[in-house]
Amino acid sequence: MATPYYIPEERVPLPPKDAEVLSTACDYCVVACGYKVYRWPVAGGKEGGPKAEENAFGEDFPVSPLGPWIAPNQHNIVLHDGQPHHVVIIPDKDAKHVNVDGDSSIRGGAIAKKCYNPQTPTRDRLKTPLIRIYGVLMPVPWDFALDIAAEVSKHVIKAHGANAYGVKTYSYQYMENTYAITKYALRHINTANFTFHDTPSDVSSTPGFRDAGFDNFAPSYEDWRDAETLLICGTDPYETKTILFTQWIMKGIQNGQKAIFMVPRRTAGVAYAEKNGGLWLDVTPGTDLLLVNAIAREIVKNGWEDSDWIKKWVNNKWESSSGFGQGTRNTPWQWRTTWGLFQTKGFEDWKKWLMAQDEFKLENAAKLTGVSPEKIKTAAQWMAKPDKGKRPKTSIMIEKGFYWSNNTGNTQAISALGIVVGAGGRPGQVIARAGGHQRGGLRGGKYPRNKSPIKVPGRRRRALDTDAYLIAGHTRLAHVIGNTWIQSMCGSQGLAKRFDELVVANPHQVRSFDKQDIIDTLKRRADSGGMVVYNQDIYLVDPIGNRYADIIFPAATWGEETFTRANGERRVRVYQRFYDPPGAARPDWWIIAQLAKRMGFDGFDWKDSNAVLEEGARFSRGSRKDFFMVKVAAKREGKTLHQKLAEFGTDGIQGPVLMRADGTLEETKRLHDTARKLPDTGPSGANRFNKKLTHFNSQTGKCNIQKSPWSLFSDYWEWMRPKGDELWCTSGRINERWQSGFDDRRRPYIVQRWPENWVELHPDDAKARGIENGDYVMVYSERVPAMKDTILGVEPKDFSFSELMKNGHIELSKAAITAVAMVTPAIKPGVAYMDFLHTSQPANALAGRVVDWISGNYNYKMGVGKVRKIGESPYKDSFRSMSFAPRDIA
């Protein structure tokens, strides 16, 4: 049987001396390594030669292994100004920041293959607007598609209200786009039926960080390197943020850093840490809170807390309650920090609470978490025990495997642990997220929380749960932009079933080529209780586009427009356009602007992407990536904002950005920098001194230390806990694939390595089920819980999982996916691990569609199911595709 294979090119052209050189950054993970783009015409057959004076690198070829060589996956042919051009895209060897060694991950290293080229698998890029007529997506002109969309949109808003217009969009795909989208959805439509790609509600992903006063991306990458002890929770940076690990954390480990990983599987990063004296806390899914608080308990029991830091930087109750006035605490962080369930009177009160909880005692926590008491003690010692009177410099890094497991509880617990060990705004002593995607959000409107129908106990509104609202039949128009809504959400197969009912099964289907007939048909569908779907994307996504969308808008992406974005240390950079988008594809800001103008909205008359960014710049003020003063500098110099940002090349400029008295720009290495001195005279000109520059994000500028009750989550965990022959089914990233694999599925090299979905099983679990490497298995559940109502809470218990079950607000459904078994001792017994977003077989189908009722986020990593063999895959006995070799090696 044939399996996917890859035959690499044997020859790659060198750029000639006169090749154009542009700067960009990788389009994938949060690190955003800097890249150089070399571009020259195909016409004439011109290429660089092997001698230094003959090529753009100024190097004699062959070069040393670390020199600027070009791999086959770093070359492509694109159209520029309508003519074929070579492009070579390689890491910037001269970068002074981020990828300082000029290296790349396997993902970024092949980014040239992302570019549209009809001779490659990218040939299926969307090139023209499409409308579904007689069940078939048919090409139509822009005006035709936009006119129809605008008329239907206006009707839905007028007839059913703004909340009937749902917008599900990315939060990161460049500031020019996110500003336009949020201006349209939040400022003009003013819908509360709005959220981003990775959550059902527009809420903070890390509520505990927000409550404590920590910014998600406060540190510089130097801080991760310079920590003496680094606790990494819920991620392996090597697998997910490779350059952050290899060029920063790894160097710290080589210099003696003690790295502690809190994850249920032993990956390459964990193996490297252990080999170099590190520690693996092999936590059972969902029990992170118990483990974190057990470590904290050991620290305070022994008096190892950073008492000087705590005395100076931790609020007492009067301070945490101060500054709110006499109104209600409707803002989520306000009511959480003043609610007795979380709020404390300060450190001593928190300590008293912590020591009184039986579940945090060493032996009890060890039993549920599966982490030995010895490991818990070791972690506490490394993080906090002074050595000859000197405290260790400890930092804490968290990511999705941690905060998507018990969202509010875990982030409250880890924030308190960070405070206890003095992880704040000091070199090598920080606490933050590692990051997933890059930071391209720029808000053009404020979320209208007062329009959300979801009320939690007290006079408190929570952002609308877009999944539950849709399932209840209230969403009459779903506008989906650049994400895989359905597979990316929990209980995804149940969500797909509801899309089928509202869209496909509705009798009002377009069966006419007449514009007015199409408009009238889609209006009737919305009025009948059905749903209309618009989709903007670069590829036809299944099923949101391929099966459900009535109108498809083709988008231009990385390299096809000049865009701006920040990375995980707040470094703002311009991503220069270097080739033409396919067909009639246009950037999302343009699509939104055309739709908005047809709907009668003002303020969308932008001539280019720079105009969008210049308008949006003032909305960056006060944010972690504040770049408004760069715009001020640009105007003083007679330049556009894009031109000014381009001057910083691949290094970019680290926000928030200030302007000195002499007009030069000042960057921010880290937020919460307690040693930073700002002018006593205060900000001058258009400068704004964000509190987070030198203090924490609370009313007083100090940290809030809060309780993290296990009881808020324990009933859900106990119910989900595997029964009989079930396993925990959790998920995450794999090094070679990014997000949904939208680019990776079009790279033969990656498809050969990962041709299908896979599931890791421990040898003991596999043996008990008669499963071997390469077997096809079914992973299934007969009890996937899902919230079926939007309810108004009166008492706190109304939203507890056990109470929701008792009162009939939870329905159970079945789900199943298939995968290729990978048997490995790297995964903890009792746990199965899968790709988090393999679109054809989504792991999220097995995760409960029940939000954390306090934050509104899903606990994506909390799936459960059974596994059984259904046959043998062609990869079981073939060594050409899908290796089963161990990955936890160092």
Predicted regions and their residues:
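Glycine-rich phosphate/diphosphate-binding loops that line cofactor/substrate pockets in enzymes
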Residues: 145-165, 220-229, 353-357, 377-395, ...
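Long, contiguous, secondary-structure-rich segments that constitute the structural scaffold
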Residues: 588-641, 740, 744-890
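Short beta-alpha connecting loops at secondary-structure transitions
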Residues: 276-282, 554-556, 570-581, 746, ...
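Active-site phosphate/pyrophosphate-binding segments
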Residues: 342-462
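Glycine/threonine-rich phosphate-binding loop and adjacent beta-strand/alpha-helix elements that clamp
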Residues: 559-581, 591-596, 823
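N-terminal export/assembly segments and adjacent metallocofactor-ligating motifs
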Residues: 1-304, 316, 330, 345, ...
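Long, well-ordered, tryptophan-enriched scaffold segments
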Residues: 270-389
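Extended redox/cofactor-interaction regions of prokaryotic respiratory oxidoreductases
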Residues: 179-251, 255-262, 269, 290, ...
